[in-house]
Amino acid sequence: MAEFKVVVSDYILPDLEIEREMVEAIGGELAIGQCQSAAELIELAHDADAMFNTYFGPVGDEVYAGCPKLKVVVRFGIGYDTIDVEAATRHGVMAVNVPDYCIDEVSDHAIGLWLALGRKIVAADRMVRTGEWGMKPLQPVLKLQGQTVGIVGLGRIGKQMARKLSAFGVELLFADPHVGADVDLGGVACRKVELEELCRLSDAITVHALANDETHHLLNAECF
């Protein structure tokens, strides 16, 4: 009989065999679901000691009340987007994130999107596939060197964005009330400005901020 139970509320990985092996190696049981409602999650986790969560949410009072043995809930990600931390605290459940989750993957993808938009890569691909050719229909195709790129949120991913973007010869700005102007980026120049100035000066803006009450609707029509 297992000494404890760990549940995965939902997942996007191909499989969770590595996680199962790790849990079972220390005497636990791993139960896996793709929960779409609080009722489904409670059915899966009513006797669980720990929970891993990806996208299903919110994990709040109803779930915690229905899982009285639960001691910890872990978000597969940097932000607590799907976890009601205050509710977890009320029920004596520790809420944990993964602060180094996919830093390179997210920054690589964001830069890929910037390249695709600026250089019209997706539009050009669609043209070629339909038998069209030529640069004229794609104009303007932007020169990226010399652009001003604004980074909203200079956490781990934002900092990695700054380091990678510096190789393109762009001017970098950032807006983040929690990071000082003297932040060390290993020699990369990235000037701190207020959000209004960042929006006014930037050719492109990349947002790497937690989803919470402070950042909800942070960028809106008034910014542009």
Give residue ranges: language-model regions.
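Residues that mark the start of a beta-strand
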Residues: K5, Q147-T148, E171
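Phosphate-binding beta-alpha-beta segment of Rossmann-like dinucleotide-binding domains, i.e.
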Residues: H91, P99-T148, Q160-R163, D182
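Short gly/ser/thr-rich secondary-structure transition/capping motifs
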Residues: L30-Q36, T54-Y55, R129-K136, L185-K192, ...
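Short secondary-structure boundary/capping segments
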Residues: R20-M22, I42-E43, E86-A87, P140-L142, ...
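Rossmann-like adenosine-cofactor binding region
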Residues: P58-V63, L173, P177-F224
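An N-terminal-biased, well-structured beta-alpha scaffold segment characteristic
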Residues: M1-V96, R200
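Glycine-rich Rossmann-fold phosphate-binding loop(s) that bind the pyrophosphate
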Residues: L154-G155
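Residue-level detector of anion-binding/catalytic polar loops
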Residues: E29, M94, A116, E171, ...
